[in-house]
Each structure stands twice: as C-alpha cells, then as structure tokens.
Amino acid sequence: MYHVVAATINPAKIKAISQAFSDIFGAGSCHIEGVEVDSGVAAQPISNTETRTGARQRVMNARRVRPEADFWVAIEAGIEEDTAFAWMVVENQKLRGESRSASFTLPAIVMKGIHQGRELGDEMARLTGIDNIKHKGGAIGAFTAGHLTRSSVYHQALILALCPFHNDIYQRKADDEDSDLI
C-alpha cells in the first residue's frame, strides 16, 4: 500500500487526491495522510508563477515532514488577473508530475474583495453565506450550481499530474530509438 502525503488538511483537496490515486493505482492501494505545511507564498497567490511555486514548496515541505512516504502531493489554488485555477504537484523519490486545473473567470464583485486583501474562499463565504466554503464545494461549486466542485476539478488535474508515474512513455529518453513505434 502506498503512503501518500497530502500537503494539506483541506477535506476537498484530500478527497480529490484520494479519488485520483484510487483511479490510477486501484481502490485501497493508498493511505492518504494530510499534513499542514507552508507554501512559502501569499495566502492568496495572485499569479500563475506564484501559485505553481506554492504547490512545489508545499511538496518540498511535506517531504521534510514525512520523508518516509511513497508520494507527496500538493494543490495550490491561485488567481491571475481575474481567472481562478490551481496547480497540482505530485512527487515520489524519482519523478515529478505537474498539471494545472481548469480555470474560470471570477466576477468583478469577487475580484473587488481579492483586491482588498481577502482570500477567494473568505470572499466567497462572505458573498454566499456558506461557512468555510473552501473546505466544501468552493467557488467552483457555488458558480456551477454544484455541477462541479473543487474536488471534481482538482481530481481531473491530479489524474494528469499522475501520468509520469504509470505511463512508460514518460520514462523514455528523448534520444531513444523510436522506430518500433511506427
């Protein structure tokens, strides 16, 4: 059984990680442990680069906390201009996989709160009246009437971030002979 350390204690993120690992490696193949670690970036990252850096740094910090694990996984949500998205980073001892989630445009009223220094989850809780929305369906759930959730959107991106760990094409070197592929 794989020991997977999730660099989060957020239930929506842990659910997505658990589902993605079960889908790729089989049900019951992984034990997910959530740990609270710092991203090293702002609480609300406001660029693609800052968000990706935050995910990478969470994985690095999770590795320090649980060096004995088989996998370390981080999800960092961010905003660039008026677009929300998240970066997924998955590592084991040899490989790293990364993927960016689907993105969506935030309305001006939400961006006003972001520009005033609030995190997206806090601003959405304020506007919707849903307590702790970021641990539930998130802004995604609110805007899609529950058709999508943070977990469902993150799940898809995590499946993509896991590609290097189960697809042998990722293990091939660029200069390998590929004539047998024709």
UniProtKB/Swiss-Prot annotation:
Family: Belongs to the YjjX NTPase family.
Cofactor(s) of this protein: Mg(2+); Mn(2+)
Positions that bind Mg(2+): 38, 68
Biological role: Phosphatase that hydrolyzes non-canonical purine nucleotides such as XTP and ITP to their respective diphosphate derivatives. Probably excludes non-canonical purines from DNA/RNA precursor pool, thus preventing their incorporation into DNA/RNA and avoiding chromosomal lesions.
Organism phylogeny: Bacteria, Pseudomonadati, Pseudomonadota, Gammaproteobacteria, Enterobacterales
Keyword Membrane assigned: no
One protein family per Pfam: NTPase_I-T
Catalysis performed (reactions): XTP + H2O = XDP + phosphate + H(+); ITP + H2O = IDP + phosphate + H(+)
One Gene Ontology term of the molecular function aspect: nucleotide binding
Entry binding sites for substrate: 68-69
Name recorded for this polypeptide: Inosine/xanthosine triphosphatase
Binding partners and assembly: Homodimer.
Domain of life: Bacteria
